[in-house]
Amino acid sequence: MNNAALDARLLAVASLVRRGARFADVGTDHAYLPLYLLDTGVIASAVAADIAEGPLASARANVLAAGRERDVTLVLANGLSGMDDLGLTDIAICGMGGELIVDILMAAPFVKNADIRLLLQPMSRAEVLRAYLASEGFAVTAERYAIAAGRAYLCLAVAYTGVPYEVDPVCAVLGDRALRSEGDNVAYAAYLDAREREALCRLRGKKSGGLATDAEDALLFAIKKEREVLA
């Protein structure tokens, strides 16, 4: 397997996996991520899990084709169910909405462990995910942004501290500048564009309904300021 099998979104996730990690990929689909990490020597073994037999069958076929059946354990599971005793250190949950990722984390209390790194790639509602992480004492330690198939994506590296904190509604959407890589500036600009379109759509809807638009106004102002920093 080579880099071509991973798009920029999954490469961003892969960049945050620690060398030698006991790794799990939740919602693995084709098992591309664990196979890439094995082939590049980042990890020695992996768990690849999915809730549906179809995607898991695709993963199994790819694992067999790569000759990695001894290195990848395939698991039919709902989220992280049954994985609390596997000694996992790095867990990727990718390609799902932020609310579903929250549900998976809530159902797996064992992830509240300072030795576990979570790699979370929400497809939507990142602000819901960030708010949950803050309320439960999970600190975001790094943010990566990538563009794949014309869409901008966010990936978060997260560690448990046990110390809850407040997250500003704007920061919940746009993230923390200090945690971003300068190499992601182009992708982050595209991410800002997408969030701006969403905010403008909500703003128009609220205005037509005679509702307050304070939240949208604040977000649009913050997006403008972020663009000035990127310029």
Label the model's feature ranges.
Residues 20-29:
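Conserved class I S-adenosyl-L-methionine
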Residues 2-6, 82, 99-231:
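Class I S-adenosyl-L-methionine
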Residues 30-43:
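Conserved SAM-binding loop of SAM-dependent methyltransferases across substrates and taxa
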Residues 45-50:
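Conserved SAM-binding motif I beta-strand of class I
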Residues 88-95:
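Short SAM/SAH-binding signature in class I
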Residues 1-20, 35, 57-86:
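S-adenosyl-L-methionine
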Residues 52-54:
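Conserved SAM/SAH-binding beta-strand->alpha-helix loop
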